[in-house]
Swiss-Prot record:
Keyword rRNA-binding annotated: yes
Quaternary assembly: Part of the 50S ribosomal subunit; part of the 5S rRNA/L5/L18/L25 subcomplex. Contacts the 5S rRNA and the P site tRNA. Forms a bridge to the 30S subunit in the 70S ribosome.
Record's GO cellular component terms: ribonucleoprotein complex; ribosome
UniProt cross-references to PANTHER family, sorted A to Z: 60S RIBOSOMAL PROTEIN L11-RELATED
GO molecular function: rRNA binding; structural constituent of ribosome; tRNA binding
Domain of life: Bacteria
Record-linked HAMAP family: Ribosomal_uL5_B
Protein name (record): Large ribosomal subunit protein uL5
Family to which this protein belongs: Belongs to the universal ribosomal protein uL5 family.
Function text: This is one of the proteins that bind and probably mediate the attachment of the 5S RNA into the large ribosomal subunit, where it forms part of the central protuberance. In the 70S ribosome it contacts protein S13 of the 30S subunit (bridge B1b), connecting the 2 subunits; this bridge is implicated in subunit movement. Contacts the P site tRNA; the 5S rRNA and some of its associated proteins might help stabilize positioning of ribosome-bound tRNAs.
NCBIfam families documented for this protein: PRK00010.1
One GO term of the biological process aspect: translation
Length: 178
């Protein structure tokens, strides 16, 4: 549905709005990266299993484990220790995830009022965090031991933040005015 909405409506409206001469200049979604940090995994190897499975069910794709690049004694982390998991979504899985995120997970998020425009990075990419991964319907609340957050990065082909914001607004992303 999201992909069809983009092809049918959004491309035409963005092309007219920004006066592009070619359809290929219209910004599009490139990928969505989801990261779940698991600090407990540095000391307990089995602590990564549950978040790994949860991220797998949320994304619909097998995550990759992430490891510490260097040792940090304050966090009791050694170089090479498992510190989380991540997944990169492209094409159809990306659109399916964003649809579930916007219409199901974000409305269920506690105290969510919308995204800030300041969350753009200056190059047309958008990053935000979710405090509770149980907002997704794929997670069974009774089977989890700890509520975890996740970071979501949306990478677009937009040149500026203004173009990326218009693309995400057309996809029904909830922004609040600053």
């Amino acid at each position: 549905m999201f992909k069809q909405l983009y092809k049918d409506n959004i491309v035409k409206s963005l092309k007219d709005k920004f006066n592009y001469s070619n359809v290929m200049q219209v910004p599009k979604l490139v990928k969505v990266c989801i990261n779940m940090g698991v600090g407990d995994a540095a000391t307990d190897n089995k602590a990564i299993n549950e978040p790994f499975d949860n991220l797998h069910s949320i994304a619909g794709q097998k995550p990759v484990l992430t490891f510490a690049k260097k040792s940090i004694s304050g966090f009791k982390i050694r170089k090479g220790a498992t510190v989380g998991c991540k997944v990169t979504l492209r094409r159809n899985k990306m659109y399916e995830f964003l649809e579930r995120l916007i219409y199901i997970a974000l409305p269920r998020e506690k105290d969510f009022r919308g995204f800030s425009v300041k969350q753009f990075d200056g190059h047309g990419n958008f990053s935000f965090g979710i405090k509770e991964h149980i907002s997704f319907l794929e997670i069974d609340y009774d089977k989890i031991s700890k509520i975890r957050g996740m970071d979501i990065n949306i990478i677009t082909s937009a040149v500026s933040d203004k173009e990326a914001k218009e693309l995400l607004l057309a996809l029904k992303f909830p922004f609040f005015d600053n």
